Amino acid sequence: MSSKLVLVLNCGSSSLKFAIIDALNGDEYLSGLAECFHLPEARIKWKMDGGKHEAALGAGAAHSEALNFIVNTILAQKPELSAQLTAIGHRIVHGGEKYTSSVVIDETVIQGIKDSASFAPLHNPAHLIGIAEALKSFPHLADKNVAVFDTAFHQTMPEESYLYALPYKLYKEHGIRRYGAHGTSHFYVTQEAAKMLNKPVEEVNIITCHLGNGGSVSAIRNGKCVDTSMGLTPLEGLVMGTRSGDIDPAIVFHLHDALGMSVDDINKLLTKESGLLGLTEVTSDCRYVEDNYATKEDAKRAMDVYCHRLAKYIGSYTALMEGRLDAVVFTGGIGENAAMVRELSLGKLGVLGFEVDHERNLAARFGKSGFINKEGTTLAMVIPTNEELVIAQDACRLTA
């Protein structure tokens, strides 16, 4: 066990993901999820020393109770882990324009996260709770807490990519622009893709597809992000588990005027009741859609719309590659495991030279990386993401 252990925290509105990772070699000593906050069934699950464990946190428990359990119950069994913690890394969904890289957390950074909360109202307030609780639980690491922003990797986008065609003062005065998300994942797979392509990162031209319950595509030119599908918020872009992605903005007015829906109703519809859930009217789970594609109309409908949208983004981002696309990369829970999504999406892009090898595609699942294209065709690859490792490495580097 090295002396570069980092506690990685990812606080959501109703959950907390945590891990202790060796920032030098990526070894994971603890990982877990506390979930169902504020509900009677609040619970925590974790993996340590090869064993799986679960416990109730108590009715109504939230971030404070979860971190208390991690410190006083889980880590109490392994005091050597606590003793060797050198830093705490926090995933922060939105850093606005202010943060282009990870930073050590101080009062100014906390204020910056608050200032960006209107763009991530479910996530940023939860991150602030996580930071406050971590400072309480680990006072000896007070100056070793690091914020790693999901938006930072996308701050290299040029103005023509991040501006909306709205009155310019809305950007200048209120920061309304494209920010993107999943930046930590897009960054990680870009680094890994460069290794697989045997190229320096700064020479890599790829399109990265992070597909999970949320999903986004990024255009990476010369190793830097030049466009991404998520926008001001994570609602824009691809079809997602429960999010609509791109729609005609006038649908919002129609829902209000013709159906009498309130702003809150429409927000809930677009963020929690749309996407795969809306199209199937049954579930947001891509596994259902894949398993039932050949036999159920709802599954086929959802999969076809999902892959059509994804193929459109890959195709359009090819135009930003300045004449050379090295590869398309799939990552995230769906990107890494849903072979059908990859095959159907790339099957629409034969004009760009894509041809999926069925056997290679099936082999690149369940944590395995690899190329999935037929020999001699445009490269496509699967790379399992590791956002926690990036967060641990940044936290270690900035607090050394």
Curated annotation (Swiss-Prot):
Substrate binds at R91. It is found in: Cytoplasm. Pfam families: Acetate_kinase. The keyword Iron does not apply. Coiled coil: none annotated. Pathway: Metabolic intermediate biosynthesis; acetyl-CoA biosynthesis; acetyl-CoA from acetate: step 1/2. Its cofactor is Mg(2+); Mn(2+). It catalyses: acetate + ATP = acetyl phosphate + ADP. ATP binds at K17, H210, L211, G212, N213, G214, D285, C286, R287, G333, I334, G335, E336, N337. PROSITE patterns: ACETATE_KINASE_1, ACETATE_KINASE_2. Mg(2+) binds at N10, E387. It comes from the Bacteria. Mg(2+). Can also accept Mn(2+). The record marks H182, R243 as: Transition state stabilizer. This is Acetate kinase. It comes from Cronobacter sakazakii (strain ATCC BAA-894).
